[in-house]
Amino acid sequence: MFKEYVSLTKPGIIMGNLISVLAGYFLAAKSESITLSLLVYTMLGVALVIASGCVVNNIFDRDIDAKMSRTRNRAIVTGSINIEFAFLFAIIMLLIGTGLLYKMANPLSAVMVLLGYVFYVFFYTMWYKRTSVYGTLVGSVSGAIPPLVGYLAVTNYLSLEAVLLFGLFCLWQMPHSYAIAMFRMKDYQQANIPVLPLVKGIQKARQHIMIYVLVFSVVALGLYAFGHTGYEYLAVVAISCYGWFKVTYRNMDESNYVQWSKSVFKTSLLAITAFSTVLGIELLPFSITF
């Protein structure tokens, strides 16, 4: 039973988001003092709020999940976990997570994580995901909140650097999510979810992916120009963005779109991991600041 409750929180999604929290935290740490305890409380608070959102997503998406082969065996769908208990589980995690951020970090980070929660649960899960091709765009807002919370936990104020960080992760979410929608298109079709590749076609989705990767690259380089990043960041981001764009530029048609989209997806993970890692490396004494 414990394992089933853990599965409701979608640990993979939590881990991916915690990497982005680290990115925001490390970026802010270049200009503000930090402590290990603040990092731990921030990570734990964000993890609990994300876990709560994922549980609520499982509850409200149970009708959709039942139609897709990838999700039809989830605990809520099979009935192995009671919906009322799952909802209580989500509420407890939400309260503890936001409470930790409010008390141990600052109220601004708690407010921001709640804003992300509202976008994910109400605007994305309950509304746009089911009704609009722009659901991915709405979801990208909630996906870009964790790094911003990591940043605000340290600084307690918004800045141009914070805005660029938020924009960068919003832009990253789009091609990443469109790639997933392409290689899982049959599942989305069975569940009648209006993702871009289904509504507009795979070539239109490819065009959008290429544009978003290009704009992502510009914003990532803008963070070097206007933020507290060094030459290590510039080198890693330039290489990562070039590699990602090169993958998206490969020929793609009906015969290879699954393979192509999986390559775009995998490269997106490498790019964002490299981005987050280099921000941490630059905190080391031998890093070169600009």
Curated annotation (Swiss-Prot):
GO terms for cellular component: plasma membrane. It comes from the Bacteria. InterPro entries: Protohaem_IX_farnesylTrfase, UbiA_prenyltransferase, UbiA_prenylTrfase_CS, UbiA_sf. It catalyses: heme b + (2E,6E)-farnesyl diphosphate + H2O = Fe(II)-heme o + diphosphate. Gene3D superfamilies: UbiA prenyltransferase (1.10.357.140). Its EC number is 2.5.1.141. Disulfide bonds: none annotated. It is a multi-pass membrane protein. Pfam families: UbiA. The chain crosses the membrane at residues 8-28, 36-56, 81-101, 108-128, 133-153, 163-183, 209-229, 230-247, 270-290. GO terms for molecular function: protoheme IX farnesyltransferase activity. Keywords: Cell inner membrane, Cell membrane, Heme biosynthesis, Membrane, Transferase, Transmembrane, Transmembrane helix. It is an enzyme of class 2 (transferase). Pathway: Porphyrin-containing compound metabolism; heme O biosynthesis; heme O from protoheme: step 1/1. It is found in: Cell inner membrane. One of its GO terms (biological process) is heme O biosynthetic process. The keyword Transferase applies. Carbon 2 of the heme B porphyrin ring is defined according to the Fischer nomenclature. Converts heme B (protoheme IX) to heme O by substitution of the vinyl group on carbon 2 of heme B porphyrin ring with a hydroxyethyl farnesyl side group. Belongs to the UbiA prenyltransferase family. Protoheme IX farnesyltransferase subfamily. This is Protoheme IX farnesyltransferase. It comes from Aliivibrio salmonicida (strain LFI1238). The lineage of its organism: Bacteria, Pseudomonadati, Pseudomonadota, Gammaproteobacteria, Vibrionales.
